[in-house]
């Protein structure tokens, strides 16, 4: 019930970008599903507004702390934007497993790492945006979760 993936709409604020969010909410069953649905709504609402990835994730984190702080619930998140115009990736990692970047030309794998704690834990958490430039056709990004 707590696994999450989505493609938040950002076309008005970042034309040409493609955004992917994947996460996992703590717990199981109906409580986890409700927390995931709420987190999804927060993220979708914030993603359509102007702002950097850091601002988006920070705002969602603060809202989750307000809503779930006393329950001990939290959500991991990997938030990735593909900038098709400039051929680069931007991402924030908030406690989620790193994504894997595969380049078939060099037959190499790279973990897209980054610092950041899960959402809903600390009102003052700091998140950092990371990037990878020079994207080429055929490269693959793998995102995963522990759910089915």
Predicted regions and their residues:
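Conserved subregion of the PPM/PP2C metallophosphatase catalytic domain
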Residues: 2-26, 30-32, 36-148
